[in-house]
């Protein structure tokens, strides 16, 4: 992603119902890189032999890897650069596997003008199925 891909929405420009999305296909490398960065080396993510003994029968991506795509949308698309996370709730609904394409979407659900806060419904889907849902509050830059 380059600087040309960044989209900035000032608080005054944001309206309820606005939404933005990003999609990423999960690779084996993504899982190993995330495991290294997060120090979460749970074998359900990094060891296929172990993962085959789990309810999922194969390795699954870290939930927070997919949740990170929500942060990417908020920081690069809506509201965009300068947005600061205040709060995020997440509910993990289904696993994400290697090869799945995760689409993270944020939709404006409320505005708090005195604090320049925006609330969002946040979701991640795979093939139209919700795998993560939640709500975020973000502080957004104002024009003035």
UniProtKB/Swiss-Prot annotation:
GO BP of this protein: fatty acid biosynthetic process; poly(3-hydroxyalkanoate) biosynthetic process; protein homotetramerization
Lyase in keyword set: yes
Residue ranges constituting the MaoC-like domain according to the UniProt record: 13-128
Catalytic activity: a (3R)-3-hydroxyacyl-CoA = a (2E)-enoyl-CoA + H2O
Organism superkingdom: Bacteria
Signal peptide: none
UniProt KW keywords: Fatty acid metabolism, Lipid metabolism, Lyase
This protein's record includes keyword Lipid metabolism: yes
Name of the top EC class for this enzyme: lyase
GO molecular function: (3R)-hydroxyacyl-[acyl-carrier-protein] dehydratase activity; hydro-lyase activity
Enzyme Commission number: 4.2.1.119
PANTHER family for the chain: HYDROXYACYL-THIOESTER DEHYDRATASE TYPE 2, MITOCHONDRIAL (PTHR43437:SF3), HYDROXYACYL-THIOESTER DEHYDRATASE TYPE 2, MITOCHONDRIAL-RELATED (PTHR43437)
Function: Catalyzes the hydration of trans-2-enoyl-CoAs with a chain-length of 4-6 carbon atoms, forming the corresponding (3R)-3-hydroxyacyl-CoAs, which can then be utilized for the production of polyhydroxyalkanoates (PHA) polymers. Cannot use trans-2,3-octenoyl-CoA as substrate.
Assembly and interaction partners: Homotetramer.
Name of the protein: (R)-specific enoyl-CoA hydratase
Organism lineage string: Bacteria, Pseudomonadati, Pseudomonadota, Alphaproteobacteria, Rhodospirillales
Gene: phaJ
